[in-house]
Amino acid sequence: MYACAGKREIVTEEKQVLPAVEDVVMYEINPRVFALKNAFNVISKHLDSIQFLGVNVVWFMPIYEIGEVNTVNSPYCIKDYKRINPEFGTVEEFKRLVELCHEKGISVILDWVANHTSWDHAWIKEHKEWYTQDSIGNIISPAGTGWNDVADLNYDNADMCLAMIDAMKYWIQEVGVDGFRCDAADYVPYTFWKQAVDSLRAIPNRKLLMLAEGKRKDHFDAGFDMNYAWDLME
């Protein structure tokens, strides 16, 4: 999809290659399309071809560990926000892929799934209050979606919000990504996005690109650079 081993050197703002928003040429990468296993290493061999297209930002579909309970094998069913899906490779291999992208003048953003988790995420047992519940206390899927493989998160819980932001910071500070494409952003309250984007942009010496999947105008007030809605295709 297009849209308008050793100690790793920390990426700083001066060394980032992030393009201006109006100059973004974005390429979506589904790792499963590139390879059935070790996708990160395979993708690294195709960066010249991607660069040849004029791409200056790559958006990776979710690369995180996915759940096994009620699964439909969707990459949007996150079991652990800080762990790599082993079918794609290791975190060190992904760090190297990010570095290779940067060397070619390509920024990297990650698909971020903030609306829900898998049913076997550790939070289900450790923090039931972090999830939306029905009248008798059962955790539920996102209402009206039919997404039965995932559990809906409760954004009225401040501790859950902080844990989510902490996980997002990990990928910027430890892995070196340049921002996020935030999945189903319209389902997540403005108050969280404002808190999250402000916290991420406060990370010293880093610039970020933030893309929201949604049509709400308040995404821009929350600090997103861009958004898009599927209504445009109708």
Which role fits each region the language model picked out?
Residues A167, Q173, D183-E234:
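Active-site-proximal helices and loops of the catalytic beta/alpha 8
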